[in-house]
């Protein structure tokens, strides 16, 4: 799906080349009767300000273009334990400072409902990737609307949790005292599911 629509939408900054291998490993677990996590086989995108070990984390900035995260954010560790498949890192306003996802050093994302319109931001890539069925869920971050705004613009569900509910360890945050990691999905039920896991 990413290959067929993302040239036009530009939700993704990078795609995880090992995603299919991860899926095959989950298939092996199922065939062998091993217990699988609650997210088994779910393709999930991650805003590019959250650390995934050994993966580029750019914050949509040329300043961090070659930064490779040395550890996993807590939310990533939790989703890995649930057998989530990280499909890739998604676009955002540079350092999460914006509400349109036009201010990425790697180019703007487009609204999947009308590419002449902005998708909102700063978690625009998250909302676009979910709305256009490139993934089932995404994690974004929200200081003053950065999950809720693009969710509204792209007709998805976005939730900013109460401050302190979700660990921010491994988030390169814009405003440490108020920023939260939150899920974006296509339904309220899926958002609640993701929130309970992270």
Regions found by a protein language model. Give the residues of each.
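Fold-level recognition of mixed alpha/beta catalytic cores in primary-metabolism enzymes, strongest
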Residues: 106, 127-198
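Gly/Ser-rich catalytic/binding loops embedded in alpha/beta enzyme cores
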Residues: 1-144
